[in-house]
């Protein structure tokens, strides 16, 4: 039986409240669960009562093989119960192929314009030097 430590929604409409529960992965989100090990009230902002966790029971269930979901793992990391590895994906922020092609074309056009401007400046300076030497 695969176990997850996950959130089960409670509360009324537009007033969410979540229980942190240990449940079988096949059970419905708000359905059958094995044990409640905490709660999360997202309505409370920056409050000590916002997230309540039973650290001892959570560690017990993790030792039994229960896997916390990403959101619960964030709570456990903040509480110092479990370590959440950082998700660093530097390639995700890079532009796509088409955008890179457009950037390369724009850079090439800019370099050509700079080269033409340098040639024009050199050509304008050359006749002035010839006139000065005569």
From Swiss-Prot:
Ranges of biased composition (kind: Low complexity): 115-134
Keyword Ribonucleoprotein belongs to the record: yes
GO cellular component, one term: small ribosomal subunit
Pfam families (UniProt xref): Ribosomal_S16
Region (Disordered): 79-134
Matching NCBIfam families: S16
Record protein name field: Small ribosomal subunit protein bS16
Organism: Brucella suis (strain ATCC 23445 / NCTC 10510)
Gene assigned in the entry: rpsP
């Amino acid at each position: 039986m695969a176990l997850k430590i996950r959130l089960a929604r409670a509360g009324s409409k537009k007033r969410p409240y979540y229980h942190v529960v240990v449940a079988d992965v096949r059970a419905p989100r708000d359905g059958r669960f094995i044990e409640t090990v905490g709660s999360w009230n997202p309505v409370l902002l920056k409050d000590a009562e916002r997230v309540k966790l039973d650290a001892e029971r959570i560690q017990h269930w993790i030792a039994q093989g229960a896997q916390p979901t990403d959101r619960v793992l964030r709570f456990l990391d903040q509480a110092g119960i479990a370590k959440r590895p950082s998700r660093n994906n530097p390639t995700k922020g890079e532009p796509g192929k088409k955008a890179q092609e457009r950037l390369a074309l724009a850079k090439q056009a800019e370099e050509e314009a700079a080269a033409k401007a340098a040639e024009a400046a050199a050509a304008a300076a050359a006749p002035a030097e010839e006139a000065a030497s005569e």
